[in-house]
Amino acid sequence: MKEIRVGLIGFGTIGAGVAKILNNNQEVIQKRLGASVSLVKIADLDIKTDRGIDIEEGVLTTSVEEVIDNPDIDIVVELIGGYEPARTFLLNAINNKKHVVTANKALLAKHGDELFELIEEKGLTLGFEASIGGAIPIIRSIRESFVANRIQILEGIVNGTANYILSKMSDENCDFDVAFKEAQEKGFAEADPTFDIEGIDSAHKIAVLTRIAYGTPITVSYTHLRAHETPEPRV
């Protein structure tokens, strides 16, 4: 059976979740792909914290180069977020002939053109479905299912924190501060929710979706941002 060898960059909450899914769902993955998926290396600055998952000895490393430069790795998954050093890591991985996966919409919004051009030049694949919509396959739908359709408008609530807060305020006629605090308590909002509250996260996602739907690369600087306001309650 073919083996797909994966390297992770980042082993925080999301990275540990990815590792756990790959380890716990091997049988399902093999049936669907006709191939096994193995974690070869995981790079993170903190490899001592217990993430609640059993990792084979020698897999964890503090050196990103052990992932990017490893000839035994087919796919590099970036899970650290932000612009740098994530951009540099992905560019180096692509230049080393690795397929790459990222959920980093901020990076894609700012440096997507550079990444997509290099990926095409090298004949590789850049997977980024998880960057927008979580488990909702919006990117694949636009790229594949609607490929022959003329998309006139993209509209919706694309930020999970905003979705929770606005729904709470509208349905229960409560104040923003109350809805926001509850969103944080339930884990919808980040410890630093600036990107969510100020609309920056939504702008990143709009930039990525616009590029896919219309073939027009835009940056966050081209979008109009407005912070949350109290909506009218539903009657």
Regions found by a protein language model. Give the residues of each.
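Short, ordered loop/turn segments at secondary-structure junctions
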Residues: 45-47, 105-106, 113, 131-133
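Rossmann-like NAD(P)H-binding beta-loop-alpha module
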Residues: 127-186, 200-201
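Mid-domain beta-loop-alpha active-site segment that forms a flexible
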Residues: 157-158, 184, 188-213
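Rossmann-fold NAD(P)-binding glycine/threonine-rich loop
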Residues: 105-126
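Conserved small/polar residues in nucleotide/adenosyl-binding loops
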Residues: 223-232
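ADP-ribose/adenylate-binding Rossmann-like module
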Residues: 94-110
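N-terminal glycine-/serine-/threonine-rich beta1-alpha1-beta2 phosphate-ribose binding loop
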Residues: 1-95
